[in-house]
């Protein structure tokens, strides 16, 4: 029964058609591409897909075909996304499909269905148990359950369920669990359960997802509560309340057939709810409900809404939502808190909580993590049950919040136990009050702190209940406590989008809730509260019913479910589920039509968003806006309009809600809150909105419930909409609410009429469940599965009720409800769809519902399992599901959805068909769901009985026909029409629903026949699809989508479901086998694929490989466009639709990774512009077309797009997202382009990301341009317009830049005026900062304008190229086909193969080869254009980097220069003048200058910004990322920056050895000159007084008179007062004594606020040596001391002795700064001996080596790419700045070019390496052997130095290298390895000769490091170097060394090392020649600064590099060098090799 993932995969491969061609469809073992339903099938790959496909196919006789559905569903439909299945390791009972097509297999299928189904039922139930077991073997703990009753109850529930035995087992497990000490047991069991669940998932997706998850949690809870009370409850419920009877009746109507006991439990629950008095019953009933996986879940929720008080439901909803949010982000922390409180109340509730816990842990334990989510969902289910009982509700909510297993279980327990006792006791007494209190306390606990909840609960309820509630709430609250400031968070959530997401979400919800709760249940004032109140007031089912009539009840139900969903969302949010939601969220606001597309894209994006909570927050905010809009609609909708409005708004809402849940649970909530303003909390706001809407409608209860539910989840947005409520819920809460309502409707009004509102609500609820499921899927596979199951359990039932009973019954209402439901379903998508399908399939709605929910649950989990490892995947599926719905609903794409859902509708029923426009879309999305629905049937007792029933002849015929249809589809051929008719059954075989799709399939199959069989997706695209690809693909895709629900195995051919298939499409497009890889691997591996995988996998394997491929990545979001795709049945007409399918292909082709990025990007994009997502789809479609011009397109927009895509994950470059396919295309087709892409990416992020992204790139590259390019009509007018638009953007940017510049000038003028006003220092600082910032902004604006212009040109060029490539290719059908398969990489085999998702078949290879040959010519021409394009892009990047670097420097300035300095410098001259002004004569002055230049004490700009010919363009500082593509590499930003800077010749990278000191020194130097001390100046005053430490104290100059300064001490107070000490201090010292006052040194010595690296670079990089004189920051003063000891373990810790204080302290390096010495009337940094510095850095390397490195600091002047070493006597003097401002020479100088060797990059790297190696590497001693060699070499070299030099001279290359290493290792790195060895030798000998050299050497090393950074952006060292460079920025040392290194490198390379060798000949000689200037500089200082600064940061890596290059170097050196030199050579070699690397 179980299959290994690999096994399954193999089967899938076969099924997918890996070998499909080879075998007849009948004989082929269809290892189906993991159909979604298959994945859902935890037990077997069954014909659920058939049943589902039946639904999908729109078979009319759904009910008649229930046997099929039951049969299939039992095995949980086949899910095509094998990836998901694999990820979850879901096994199936039998690979039914392998034998599916043969008669024997049919017979076997029937048998297996009977047996397997039964087994599955059992498994499912057991799984359910397992789920419970997930929670723990809890379910097996039957005897230990809180009461025998429970176990019985559970058993009864089991009996109700199809598999009584299974149910019993779960019940028992639950009981045992409970007995164990539920929480612990649950927790303990959870892990095993999780494992078990995982296996279950592996075995049976259905079980895991549906049965296990839903049932596990629900059952567990039910088992605990239900076991005791299930029977009793059932009886009691029936006995107890009038509502109960209604509920029962409804339940019976809806659930009677469903053996799950949906009706019974529903009845019980309903009764319980109304009867508040029987809380225990409610709980147990609810538990039963939960127990009945889907039905129970739905029931519980519906009951809560109906039977329980609305307040309970609401509160539960809210709590759940909050919890969900918390769980997602803060669930885990909360869990811990809750655990404590929960434990306290665990006694009675233990069982229930344990059950929940089991579910939760199960999830966590599961490899897929679905269980976790599942657990959460389970918790939710339990919560729903709890909600039935007032206290239980609270606990449930609490659990939901917990989301982590512990919390949910514990909460459950607490509430359960209290509930049971309190409720039982007080049930009668406080029917409504009880509910009321519960709701309130739940609310409070969830929203507010638990304390608040307790208060509310206690005060309102009897002590018992209050206590229970309080404890429950407490637990709940504790979860939220995570976000204790939830309310605050809500308010700040937008700001704190990210933090809010994790903790805030919960809090936001919590805070609002608590207020709402406090506001009270009556809380009309606060809708949330109101909803609670309303719930309270309408505790009775009667009230619920009215609500249900109004549609308000849906809201209440939504509440409960909302929380559930939120919970799931929360979890998913982290993983990306939220992102999806978020994406959707934003879209709804944007527009219904677009949002669907976005939703489709959401799948991938979700992950991204999850990663980017902030982004998510934005989206959530956006969604919120939509929400209010929805709200407005809500009033209108609340009554009849609810369904319709809901549909439209629902989509929006769903998206919004998802967004909220996913990305920024809290922030989104906040957004909602803000917009809604109704509630303080987002949840609150949601609820309030709903409430208010409901209030308007006059349905208090309904409103409250709905609003509350929605609120919790992010529903807030939804709630405000009214429809939005449903939708929001449908996303998060809506579904659950709808589910509840659905149940209520089904139960209460199922027999009666599901009232429109009710109907829509049920729909909503289903949606929410689905959404939860979706989120769960995304979040964790195991958890997701469980959650899915759980959600499915509730949702499917609701959906089923809704569709089967309610929907079918209420055709008109259904349409409304259907829309709502559809929206909901869409959000849930897969789950809902299957449910709907299931219901139609089963004749009895209830049974179907139960089955559906179960199957759905399972199925969804399977889907999720598919993407076990990938939240995105899962999310994608769910998103897919949700998105399509949302898209349909929100977007005007409902038509498309309807079409794609048509089959679903047919399957579901004619009634469902009515909903088909809405619901079908869901189903299409939820194709998997549909199978899931079937699966649930199998799991239910009714199902089991059905399974046991023999098939009728007609059924057998139908099943066989379905098998054949499916086989044909798998094979990629069109099924026979006769088979289709038979398969669908009914009078006309449901022809109306599938004929279009079928015809499309036939056409597509004919066109792609050749490619389909063996060729992978690509081959199809390459082959027949080409011309028809555009039309056929779009048509087929659209056709596929409508025709085939994602889950429908039969519909693997592309149909309307193409959207769904998008992911599975890759499978289908790849051909049967290709789909295998594509679906299973692609879906599994890439998040996008995963997204697709859940829904589309089984669909994709079939006919539309290409389109499907494309859709893989964007399938989730593309679903939106897919709807259009459906309409796209007209091939080319619907570009968006085409885009969708094409885009998907492109995305998929692009690469899984790219796809994922793209998807993620899409969500990001969505918020920016809804159009973008469609554009993206468009783009993708165009990509297909673009295939013609793969190269050209790539080069321009594609590259940008790809860059953006790549960056998208990290940066919000959504605009380029639309070209994910292009990116893939680029990468696949043109590796070179890809690399270039990398550069543009940096550029994009740096500049386009900021500017172009929003304005230009988005429209042009965002997808419009690309899309246009990709369109068949090569360059459409649209594209041209986009290009024009881009040009306009560039012009606008220019104008903006001009404005910025003018503004900057104005500001500067103002500053100049102000500078004379004698403003306070703070004011001056602010002004200076503002001026700098403005200058930076102006610079950036300029750069941006230039870049925009360049980009526009590049885009135009790319467009032209695309046209060139496209036109011919467009005519070539083969190309379009290829395009489909490989949108972006059509031209290159690599792209084809890559695009295929790593699925390489012979066909794909052939196609790739073919494509490669076709494209060779194109590539040649395109390459040139591309090169030009890249050039332009690089130029733009350079400009951007320039601007950024300038801006970065400005921004990075630790504190702004004085106003007068600023004024002196002026806006354009500021930097240079600042440098000069800072220049100081002392050697350290240079360093100081450099620091000054960067003006960032905290952040040191590694490169010095020199005003060169570039016109003062500043290179990027360390912190600033200004990648200059000139290098052609875009690796580390910093490295890139440096490299770019170097290339720009504007920056000289200097080691910042003394950077910390440099700044200090600069300021110190200024201080030295009294002129620097002015009024308002910050100074340091030296005080030696008794009672005071003798130290330098910070002070502020208040006034200056007579050479005295009146200072106010910052840290010294008057002896007995709080006033700061003020005193007069002489500005000058007596005689030669140092003055007691000096300008304050920068805070460099203080901990930097920047990155640790920077701080370390600046401070830690300073290598402190023993004996160094330092100032230590101690007790707010700088104490002068001497380092006496260094901590060997911690480099950053030194022992400093303070002679003045006669004490020794251990100080951290960052609290040290070099002491300043008064010398020659100046403050000069007293540098430690070079040895000290080197030693500290070296660690390994001998100090001698450092000295060797250079006696004087090396200053490099770069001229004509050659560096001249200047001996700078005073590094600190202006010459240094001159060096820094290397003007023309620097401009000319290119680091890469500096060596002038063929290996320019290598030389650069070498430089870096050399510096690093000799510096940090040697110091750190990474290369120990190298060190030894070095030492040995030193002696040897010393001896043979002359000979070496001679050799070097003779061998230019060798000498150069040797020379360079001598200088700093940089040169050596650059130089040939042999040369390096020589140099090293020489260098080593020098160290012996001259020790100071090592320091210079070190400096050079540092410099080299920095420089190498520039060169080796890609190298790991680059990062280090950049850091080190930042650290070692000491201008003097860094520059001097750089000069030496560079010059040496240059000269060595140029002079063949003759010069170098000569310079190296003598220790000093070498240093001096290479760095003659350095020689003049004080060697000690230079050495100390440089070596110390360079050594630390950079050396370690360099050392490592040296080691690596050693072998190479040695090889070369050994041959050409003396053996004595070899050792050193080897070391230098290692440097070289690393640099090369």
From Swiss-Prot:
Predominant location category: nucleus
Consequence of gene disruption: Swollen root tips, disordered root cell morphology and root elongation inhibition under salt stress, accompanied by increased accumulation of reactive oxygen species (ROS) such as hydrogen peroxide H(2)O(2) in the roots. Reduced accumulation of cellulose and pectin but increased lignin levels under high salinity. Salt-hypersensitivity is exacerbated in plants lacking also IMPA1 and IMPA2.
Example of a GO biological process term: response to salt stress
KW Nucleus (keyword) present: yes
Molecular functions per Gene Ontology: promoter-specific chromatin binding
Keywords: Nucleus, Stress response
A Pfam family it matches: Agenet
Extent of Low complexity compositional bias: 504-514, 841-852
The keyword Nucleus appears for this protein: yes
Protein name (database record): Protein SWOLLEN 1
